[in-house]
């Protein structure tokens, strides 16, 4: 989609507004950190445990999520014969046709049984 003049103008004005307000915002953040840094940290410690970075990295382990249902990679069926919820009916029908095509065997031609 092409960029309209209006959207270009709005983007330009937002950038100028950010430039104008940046010093005020920086001062506001610095004042918050100067006055109440200890108070803020005390509130955070009450709510959650604060760990140093090294301990947090050591504590992190590579655990994988346990998945209860096992799916066949080729047919995408789970152990109960159900397709995934995101699959639409056309895809299900196509996979089912492929699966049944392999199962069919040629029948012996009917003839006179003597």
UniProtKB/Swiss-Prot annotation:
InterPro entries in alphabetical order: LLPH-like
Domain of life: Eukaryota
Compositional bias annotation for Basic residues: 1-21, 91-108
GO CC annotation terms, alphabetical: chromosome; nucleolus
Keyword Cell membrane appears in the UniProt entry: no
Record flagged with keyword Nucleus: yes
Family: Belongs to the learning-associated protein family.
Protein name (database record): Protein LLP homolog
Native species: Gallus gallus
Taxon lineage: Eukaryota, Metazoa, Chordata, Craniata, Vertebrata
The encoding gene: LLPH
């Amino acid at each position: 989609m092409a960029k309209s003049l209006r959207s270009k103008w709005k983007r330009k004005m937002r950038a100028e507004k950010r430039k104008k307000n940046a010093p005020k915002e920086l001062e506001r953040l610095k004042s918050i950190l100067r006055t109440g840094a200890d108070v803020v940290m005390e509130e955070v410690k009450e709510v959650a445990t604060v760990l140093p970075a090294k301990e947090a990295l050591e504590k992190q382990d590579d655990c994988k999520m346990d998945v209860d249902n096992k799916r066949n990679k080729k047919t995408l069926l789970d152990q109960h014969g159900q397709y995934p919820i995101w699959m639409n009916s056309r895809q299900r029908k196509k996979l089912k046709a492929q699966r049944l095509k392999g199962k069919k065997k040629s029948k012996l031609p009917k003839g006179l049984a003597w």
